[in-house]
C-alpha cells in the first residue's frame, strides 16, 4: 500500500490591524502575494512538499490548447481552467472542453487555496451571455460548465447573469447540457433572491463546492460559512427535485479521514447527488500549503464510502476537480447529453 505523505505546517493568524492594507481599484487584479498577504490568514515557514508520482500531469502535444485559447480570446471569454491554474487544463483543452468563468476575472473573496485574483470587480458585461452562447455553439459542445467569481458587490450575487447565460446557450445550442458551479450567494436576502432568479431558467446540474471540512473554514474559506453552503444546496434541490445537485471537496489542507467522512454524510443529508474529491495543489508559495498528499488507495476508499452513502456518482482521485470530466459524471448520474 502507498504510504501517505504528511507533515505539520505552522499557521499564523494575522489580525486585521497588522495585515497589509488593501488598495483596490476597479478591475485591477491582486494575485499571489498581493492577494494572500492582505488576508487575515498567513502561513509561516512552510516549505513546498515534493509531489508524489501519482500527481504528475501529462502535457499532450499539438495545437489544440492554443487554438481553443485563441477562440476564447476572440470572444473575450475567460475560463476558470486558466484563472485558477487547473492542473488538467492541457487534457481538457486538448479535447475541446472548458469551464467558462463569467462575471469577470476579479473575485471579492480572498480564499487561501484559490489562485483567482482578488479585487474590486467591474460591472457585469451585458454582452457576455451572447458571446458565451456563440462560442458554445461554434465549438459544438454537448456539455458545458459555467462558473463565476464571488460577486459580493451584487445584490443577487450574480444570479441573473447566470440565468442570462443559461438562456442564451439554450437559444443558440438547445442540445447542450448546462452545469453551473455557483458561489454561495451569502449575505442578507441574497440566497433568497438568487434561488428565485435561478428558478426562472434552471440548469441541468447545480453545483456548489463545499471545498473543505468545517473546522478548516477559518483558514481556507474566510468569508464563507459551511452551513450556509449546505443550506444553499438543499434549498435548490427542494425547489427542483428532478435536477441533479453536486458538490466538491479538496484534500490535503489538514483534514482527517473522519472529518471528510462527516462532510460526505452532511452533503448526503442535504440532498446532494454527486460529489467530487480531489487533491489540493498549492498554486503559489503564498497560498495555503499542502499538508499532505492523500494516496490513491485513500481516494478509492472514499469513493466506496460515498457510494455506500447513496451518492448517484462519486469521482474521487488525486487529479479530480469539480468540473473535470463533468460530462461523464453527469452521465453517470443520469443526466443525458
Swiss-Prot record:
Pathway: Protein modification; protein lipoylation via endogenous pathway; protein N(6)-(lipoyl)lysine from octanoyl-[acyl-carrier-protein]: step 2/2. It comes from the Bacteria. It is an enzyme of class 2 (transferase). InterPro entries: Aldolase_TIM, Elp3/MiaA/NifB-like_rSAM, LIAS_N, Lipoyl_synth, rSAM. [4Fe-4S] cluster 1 binds at residues 81, 86, 92, 323. Residues 93-312 form the Radical SAM core domain. This is Lipoyl synthase. It comes from Xanthomonas campestris pv. campestris (strain ATCC 33913 / DSM 3586 / NCPPB 528 / LMG 568 / P 25). The lineage of its organism: Bacteria, Pseudomonadati, Pseudomonadota, Gammaproteobacteria, Lysobacterales.
